Each structure stands twice: as structure tokens, then as C-alpha cells.
């Protein structure tokens, strides 16, 4: 601690910062965002933003729902936490490698390769969820290792994509406003992974078919009160929505899933992801890699404050 305090004090009083360029020192907040607005009008920047907005649709169901389905099928939350713990050192190692791979003429290649891997892993995740042992069977060691391996590989591909695209942002960002430039692109990238999630969750509910089954000996009056009829042999309504689950729980019933919308939704997402990759994202990325770094910037002329 003493050495840290000494070093910090030395930096505070004796270290001098490198002189700023006149363009950086004279640009205020208004000027920076004025430049950013002009940058957003560049055709290749608009294409990059468009790619960010659609790129994560393909594996959105896998990211948002697979973990929930594994827990729903009997995997303990502590087991998922173990997967995260195992995954952490791999993220550090492969994140560094991804940054190394993202240099040169084909800076987006690691991002594209990881894109394909995530689509494949989304299909693998569906197979893992489908093959989960049904209660009262327990999850065996081999199957548990398979789940952990799939989780680590998914996280690895996600890390490669994140680091790869961040490295590309670093290459194209204007050094004068690099922080603002990269914040804008990273915000758009995060938004691309956020906006589809609502629709994915709604699709899972929409495609799911389930019914409530009354327990043996349930009171006729209770059925009449909750469901409007007293015949326990008839379907007691859907059991997918929160309201349906609540009605079923009021009589002590059980929800039976006839068709899980997770598989339909994830399949639709993978098909959309593969189609957009082949016909939209890949051609755009190839063209963006050919854009020279100066073309991602705009002239600072006109943003300097007037001097008297």
C-alpha cells in the first residue's frame, strides 16, 4: 500500500501529461457531438450501425431462454454458476487471442467466424435442452460435462465477437474523439442485443401450448369459481401466461406443456441469423474492411471556436 501511495503521489505532482493537440484542447462537448452527427451521416458508418442492429437476432433465443430452460428441466442454478466460474479464465485467454486475430486487412474475420459458431451452438443448445433427463432421473456426470462445455463454448464465441468488434472499433475511431466514437458504436452494438429480446420472449410464449390439469378430488365449487365450469375432465385453459399459471395454482393443478415454443423460436432465430449473415452481413463486412481508416473520419474544420 505504501508503494502505491508513493507512486500515486509522484504521478500527481511530478508527471506531466503529453501536450494536447490544438484540435483536441479546443473542442467542447457541442463540437464533439457535432462531429459525431456528421460521422453518423457517412455511408459506411450507417452500414456498420445497421449490421450491429441485426447481428444478434440469430442467437438471441439461445442467450435469453436456454439457461432458463436448463433450470426448468432440473439443472441447478449453482451448476450454472459453476459454468461461469470455469469460463472466466477462458474469457481472459481467448479475449487476448481475439484481439490479436482482429489485426490486419481482415479485421472482422474473427467476428464473422464466431458468428457462425454461435449459430451452430444455438442448435446444439436446443439438442441439449431436448435431451435433458426427465424427472425423476438425475443429470449424469457426462451430460453435466456436456452442458458445461456448451456453456463455455457459447461464452467463448461471444467473447471473441465482443473483443473482435471492439478491436475493429478501435482501428476506425478518430483519435481526436476516440472515446466518444467507440462509446457510440458500442452502445449501438449493445442495443442490437437488447431490442430483439422482448420479441423473442413473446414468441416463446406465443408458440408454447400448455394446459392445466386439475388434481384428483378437487372441489366442484372451486373449478366453477376459477374456470367457469365444474367438469375436471375438460381442458382447464392455457397454462402459459402468468394469469393462466395463477388460475391453475389456485386449484392446486399442474401445468402440462404440450409444445415448447423455445424450439420454434430458436429455430426461427437461427434461420434469420443464417440468412442475414449470408446475404446481408457478410457482404457488408467485406466492404467495410476495405474502407481506409481516414474515410471513417470527418474534417474538424468548422468546429473550432472563433478566436478574436
PLM segments and residue spans:
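A membrane-interface helix-boundary motif in multi-pass transporters
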Residues: 1, 109, 202-275
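C-terminal membrane-cytosol helix-exit motif in multi-pass small-molecule transporters
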Residues: 3-20, 277-284
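Juxtamembrane intracellular "pre-TM" segments in multi-pass secondary transporters
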Residues: 17-47, 298-308
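Pair of pore-lining "gating" transmembrane helices in MFS-fold secondary transporters
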Residues: 40-65, 152, 156
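Loop-to-transmembrane helix entry
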Residues: 46-49, 66-90, 111, 145-146, ...
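Loop-to-transmembrane helix entry/capping segments in MFS-fold secondary transporters
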Residues: 77-78, 144-145, 175-186
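Helix-to-loop junctions at the C-terminal end of transmembrane segments
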Residues: 91-113, 204
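C-terminal ends and interior cores of transmembrane alpha-helices
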Residues: 116-140
Amino acid at each position: 500500500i505504501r508503494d502505491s501511495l508513493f507512486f500515486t503521489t509522484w504521478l500527481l505532482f511530478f508527471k506531466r501529461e503529453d501536450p494536447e493537440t490544438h484540435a483536441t484542447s479546443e473542442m467542447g462537448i457541442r463540437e464533439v457531438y457535432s462531429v459525431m452527427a456528421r460521422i453518423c451521416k457517412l455511408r459506411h458508418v450507417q452500414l456498420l450501425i445497421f449490421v450491429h442492429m441485426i447481428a444478434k437476432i440469430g442467437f438471441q433465443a439461445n442467450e435469453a431462454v436456454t439457461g432458463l430452460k436448463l433450470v426448468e428441466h432440473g439443472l441447478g442454478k449453482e451448476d450454472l454458476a459453476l459454468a461461469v466460474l470455469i469460463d472466466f479464465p477462458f474469457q481472459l485467454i481467448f479475449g487476448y487471442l481475439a484481439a490479436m486475430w482482429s489485426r490486419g486487412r481482415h479485421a472482422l474475420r474473427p467476428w464473422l467466424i464466431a458468428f457462425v459458431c454461435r449459430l451452430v451452438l444455438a442448435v446444439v443448445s436446443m439438442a441439449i435442452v431436448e435431451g435433458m433427463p426427465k424427472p425423476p432421473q438425475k443429470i449424469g456426470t457426462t451430460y453435466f460435462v456436456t452442458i458445461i462445455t456448451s456453456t463455455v463454448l457459447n461464452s467463448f464465441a461471444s467473447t471473441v465477437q465482443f473483443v473482435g468488434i471492439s478491436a475493429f472499433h478501435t482501428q476506425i475511431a478518430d483519435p481526436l474523439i476516440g472515446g466518444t466514437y467507440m462509446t457510440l458504436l458500442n452502445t449501438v452494438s449493445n442495443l442490437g442485443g437488447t431490442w430483439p429480446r422482448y420479441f423473442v420472449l413473446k414468441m416463446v410464449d406465443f408458440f408454447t401450448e400448455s394446459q392445466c390439469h386439475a388434481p384428483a378430488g378437487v372441489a366442484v365449487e372451486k373449478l366453477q369459481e376459477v374456470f367457469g365450469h365444474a367438469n375436471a375432465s375438460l381442458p382447464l385453459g392455457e397454462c402459459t401466461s402468468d394469469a393462466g399459471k395463477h388460475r391453475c395454482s389456485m386449484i392446486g393443478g399442474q401445468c402440462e406443456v404440450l409444445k415448447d415454443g423455445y424450439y420454434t423460436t430458436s429455430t426461427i432465430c437461427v434461420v434469420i441469423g443464417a440468412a442475414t449473415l449470408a446475404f446481408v452481413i457478410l457482404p457488408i463486412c467485406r466492404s467495410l474492411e476495405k474502407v481506409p481508416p481516414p474515410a471513417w473520419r470527418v474534417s474538424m474544420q468548422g468546429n473550432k471556436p472563433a478566436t478574436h
